[in-house]
Amino acid sequence: MVLSSELLASILAEVRPLLGQGKVADYIPALAQVPADRLGMAVCTVEGELFTAGDAFEPFSIQSISKALSLTLALTLYQEEEIWARVGKEPSGQPFNSLVQLEFEQGIPRNPFINAGALVVSDLLETRLTAPRQRTLELVRRLSGNPAIMADQVVARSEYQHSARNAAIAYLMKAYGNFENEVDKVLQSYFNACAIRMSCVDLARAFIYLANRGVPLGAGEPLLPARTTKQVNALLATCGLYDEAGDFAYRVGMPGKSGVGGGIMALIPGELCVCVWSPELNKAGNSLAGTAALELLAERLGRSIF
C-alpha cells in the first residue's frame, strides 16, 4: 500500500477497539490524569513529507523516548568509547528499573535505554555541560522545528517526588565508581528530559536523522556520523522497548523507542520515522494500541529492517 494519511487513519480505526484493554501509567501521579482514549499517529519521510491521523498534534510526556535524545546529545560531546566504557550495549531481559542485574554486573548498566543506563548518560551530560536541561530542550526544538516545546514541570516534580528507586540505582552505580556528579542534580535533569512534552508530529520529525544517516530534517550537515547512527539504530532494535524488544522486533521489525507516556517512535532507515501515541500500556510498559498500530503499518507497507 502507498503511505498516506488515509492509511494511518484506517490503521487507527482498526486498533481503536483495543482501547480499554491496557492501563495508563499511574506510578507517576501526573501521568495517571492523561485521558486514556487518546490515539494519534504521524509519519515523516526523509524527504520531509508528513502524514498524520488522530491526535497526532497533541503533546504528551515523552518519558523514556527522551533516552534516545540524551544518548544522541552525549554522542556529540564524547568519543564513543568514553560512553561505552560506562554503559553496555546488550539487552537486559529485566524490568527497566531493576537493581538486581546492576549489582551483579558491578554498576555497569546493560544499555543506555534502561533507567540505570540513561542515568549514566545524564551523568555524562552533567559533567560536560553547564546547562544540560536547556541544551536538551534546544536539541529537541531544533530537530523537530518546534521552538515551543517545553518540559512539564508538574510531571518532572511528580517523578522527582517518587524517585527513590532511581536514586537507589544512581547511588549503587556511585558505589561502584560509575557516577561522577551529585545524584540529586542528575536526577532532576533526568526527570526534566522525561517530562518533555512533544506530539507525534514533533517526534516523527525530530528523529528523522536516525532514518537519514544522521542528517536532521532540513539540515545539510549531519548531527551524528552515519556509522554512529547505524549503531544507535542497532541498540534501538535490540534494547529500545524494555524487555519486550524481541517481541517488538518480531511483530514490527523496526528500531524503536517507547515511553510510559504511551508514545512509541520507530523508523525505517533510508525511508521514514513514525510516532504513535496511545496512553494505555501493556504489562511490559509499552503502548498496547500503539504497538498494534505499528505492526499494521509495517504489514500494510510491506516494510521491515529484516
From Swiss-Prot:
The keyword Endoplasmic reticulum does not apply. It catalyses: L-glutamine + H2O = L-glutamate + NH4(+). It is an enzyme of class 3 (hydrolase). Keywords: Hydrolase. GO terms for molecular function: glutaminase activity. One of its GO terms (biological process) is glutamate biosynthetic process. Substrate binds at residues 64, 115, 159, 166, 190, 242, 260. InterPro entries: Beta-lactam/transpept-like, Glutaminase. HAMAP family: Glutaminase. Belongs to the glutaminase family. PANTHER family: GLUTAMINASE. This is Glutaminase. It comes from Aeromonas salmonicida (strain A449). The lineage of its organism: Bacteria, Pseudomonadati, Pseudomonadota, Gammaproteobacteria, Aeromonadales.
